[in-house]
Amino acid sequence: MFRNALRQSTRAVGAFSATGRVAARNAAPVVSAVQARTYADAKATPTEVSSILEQRIRGVQEESNLAETGRVLSVGDGIARVHGMANVQAEELVEFASGVKGMCMNLEAGQVGVVLFGSDRLVKEGETVKRTGEIVDVPVGPELLGRVIDALGNPIDGKGPINCKEKRRAQLKAPGILPRQSVNQPVQTGLKSVDAMVPIGRGQRELIIGDRQTGKTAVALDAILNQKRWNSGSDEDKKLYCVYVAVGQKRSTVAQLVKTLEENDAMKYSIVVAATASEAAPLQYLAPFTGACVGEYFRDNGKHSLVIFDDLTKQAVAYRQMSLLLRRPPGREAYPGDVFYLHSRLLERAAKMNKTHGGGSMTALPVIETQGGDVSAYIPTNVISITDGQIFLESELFYKGVRPAINVGLSVSRVGSAAQLKAMKQVAGSLKLFLAQYREVAAFAQFGSDLDAATKQTLNRGERLTELLKQKQYSPMAVNEMVPLIFAGVNGFLDSVPVAKILQWEADFLAHLKTNEPEIMATIDKEGAISKDLEAKLRDVIQTFTKSFLG
């Protein structure tokens, strides 16, 4: 009898063509769909399929709501294969009887591949799974400010529940071409080398790339801390709400970062989204989308946000892990073929909206970690091609004490110069080119001692400018402080100051300006440009001060 039933189901499977199978699945009753599916899985999971066949032999009907529920065929490595759930959507949340949640990633003819958000040890074979009907959505709004949440929007800082009035889908489509506007407002990071040479605009995507331990997070964190000077005011147009997404980092690192933000009074305007190293790969994959979703709320309400993805290498690794376990075909470096789309659909959500769409903006600072300075690897080249420029940090410079360790030659901002303040553009226009020339000359100068006067002067000034661009961590500067300093360096007023005393000169000069010449800084702030009169005054003040400093 059992053999006859098996023969019947074999005939039924043979009768379906490739197209007929889909039509039968949609049109025929649930039982025939089960017939077509179960035999396909017979080799993979004989126990579960034979139990389904046994039910059919005994004349037991499958439960009528098979479209809404399913049964676990196999589970392991954070992946569950589920039979049933015919109507499930891609990336829909499902709930297992054990309470574990998962997300449907692979929708196949006979089964659904589900990635688990919790431990797979809690899920058993044969367990029932039910649809929730929800695609991953997260709470958004100003209520999140000052909080730490996980990839699904649940609070993890022990400060109680978050009462958000609105929820949004984590993976929304990026805005089209028409609602956008070109970048025209600056994001001040407070770092001399960034604001002068690789300026960032609101709505831009600027990549921070470098080896491990080169200060990538420090650059992003300084940018957050520098927003305090505007965010403590009431002008909504100048405020920049910050979202920091930690992917695959140690919990101790995230805790230290939150502590730093709290100590510097920056947590008031910041939101931290954390999917740490100990969490499941699907959560590390989702966290950047959650961060982008939170930032988009401000963008779409005419406000401005800055989202830091730290780092997207770990997101790509988590996505690779999920894809390989779901048996999707691997490509270069074993990443799936759509890993480029993973990052492009995320970073395209950063935009400057035009006036009719509220004029808000979302700026993205993705972080990528390289191996041994290799920027030609798969993920680094992908993200470099998606973003509007990159800040390249070099371990060699970092160990020499040049911090932030920005390689001027390889760092570029493709759209930020349009947003740079006029005063900064006036003084720093030639700075990047000069420093790139200096690095080139310095490399050759090691070979020969016979150098002409012009080369010696380039080396002399280059050393001082490099020293001037050094900056301590967590001490961002205002633009009206940077402009006089860079003006002094570029115009050769520091050529006579010993290199070892440059940072001392900087501290003393800023103190002198604040005490004795506050109107210079006030004028730079107010006008945003350097007039002929102001330039003459600056020259006079710098020369007088440098004489007394050296005297």
UniProtKB/Swiss-Prot annotation:
Question: Is the keyword Ion transport in the record?
Answer: yes
Subunit comment: F-type ATPases have 2 components, CF(1) - the catalytic core - and CF(0) - the membrane proton channel. CF(1) has five subunits: alpha(3), beta(3), gamma(1), delta(1), epsilon(1). CF(0) has three main subunits: a, b and c.
- Biological processes, Gene Ontology terms: proton motive force-driven ATP synthesis
Q: Which PROSITE patterns match?
A: ATPASE_ALPHA_BETA
Q: What HAMAP family does this protein map onto?
A: ATP_synth_alpha_bact
Q: Which Pfam families match?
A: ATP-synt_ab (PF00006), ATP-synt_ab_C (PF00306), ATP-synt_ab_N (PF02874)
InterPro entries, from UniProt? Answer: ATP_synth_asu-like_sf (IPR023366), ATP_synth_asu_C (IPR000793), ATP_synth_asu_C_sf (IPR038376), ATP_synth_F1_a_nt-bd_dom (IPR033732), ATP_synth_F1_asu (IPR005294), ATPase_a/bsu_AS (IPR020003), ATPase_F1/V1/A1_a/bsu_N (IPR004100), ATPase_F1/V1/A1_a/bsu_N_sf (IPR036121)
**Site positions for Required for activity, renumbered to this chain?**
S411
Origin, by domain of life?
Answer: Eukaryota
- Function, in words: Mitochondrial membrane ATP synthase (F(1)F(0) ATP synthase or Complex V) produces ATP from ADP in the presence of a proton gradient across the membrane which is generated by electron transport complexes of the respiratory chain. F-type ATPases consist of two structural domains, F(1) - containing the extramembraneous catalytic core, and F(0) - containing the membrane proton channel, linked together by a central stalk and a peripheral stalk. During catalysis, ATP synthesis in the catalytic domain of F(1) is coupled via a rotary mechanism of the central stalk subunits to proton translocation.
Which protein is depicted?
Answer: ATP synthase subunit alpha, mitochondrial
NCBIfam families linked to this entry: atpA, PRK13343.1
Source organism per UniProt: Neurospora crassa (strain ATCC 24698 / 74-OR23-1A / CBS 708.71 / DSM 1257 / FGSC 987)
Which keywords accompany this UniProt record? ATP synthesis, ATP-binding, CF(1), Hydrogen ion transport, Ion transport, Membrane, Mitochondrion, Mitochondrion inner membrane, Nucleotide-binding, Transit peptide, Transport
Cellular location(s) = Mitochondrion; Mitochondrion inner membrane
**Which Gene Ontology cellular component annotation is one that this UniProt entry carries?**
proton-transporting ATP synthase complex
Homology family: Belongs to the ATPase alpha/beta chains family.
| GO MF term list | ADP binding; ATP binding; proton-transporting ATP synthase activity, rotational mechanism
The entry marks the following residues as binding ATP, namely G210, D211, R212, Q213, T214, G215, K216, T217
